[in-house]
Amino acid sequence: MERTEGWAAGVVLTGLGLRSEADPEQFARELRGTDRLISEYLSEQALAQQPPERRSLLLRLSVLDRMSAELVESILSVDDATSLFEELERESMFLVALDRRREWFRFHPMFRELLRYRLRAEHPGAATEILTAAADWHIARGDASSAIDYLLEAGSGERAATVISGCGREMLERNDTV
C-alpha cells in the first residue's frame, strides 16, 4: 500500500503480481513503476492516450522531484504550466499537489519511474540537461539545497561542490543539510 500510495489500480495490480511470486514480501518491497503489469497498465491507460507532444512533456517533467509552474515554464519552455497542472489533475495523470496553494507538484512515484525509464530509453541525454537547468533555476532563487541535489543527480559533483563551498557557511548557520 505504501508503494502504491493508495492508487486503487496499483493495489489491484500488486495483488495480481503477488499471486505468482515465490516471495510475496520481497515482491511488494521491490515493486516499481517499471514492473511488467504496472508498466503495461500505465502505458496503455496513461501514456498511449496522450498526443506525442504531451507525452514528450510528461517524460521530461518526470526528471523533476517536484515542480512548480514557474520552474516548468522557465526550464522546459512551457507557456502556461498552471493550466497544464490543472489539466493533468483533471485527467488523473498521477499528479500530486504538495502544498495547499497548489503551487508545487510531483508525479506518483510509480508513474514517475515509468516516465523516467522511457525518457532514458528514448532520449538518453535529456535528463542531465533538465537536471542542470533545474539546478540553475534553484541557484538563481537562493535554493542551494535543491540545486545541489539536482547537480549530484546529474553527475555534476564538481559543480555541486562549488555551490556547497559558495554557500556552505550560510547553510550551516541555517542548519540546512543536503
Task: List where the protein language model places each region.
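Short, polar/flexible loop-turn hinges at active-site or ligand-entry regions and domain interfaces
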Residues: 24-28, 78-79, 119-125, 171
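Short acidic (Asp/Glu) and glycine-rich catalytic loops that position anionic groups and cofactors
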Residues: 21, 113, 160-162
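Short amphipathic alpha-helical interaction/hinge segments
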Residues: 12, 18-26, 69, 96, ...
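Short helix-capping and inter-helix turn/linker motifs at the boundaries of alpha-helical repeat units
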Residues: 33-37, 48-49, 106, 125-126, ...
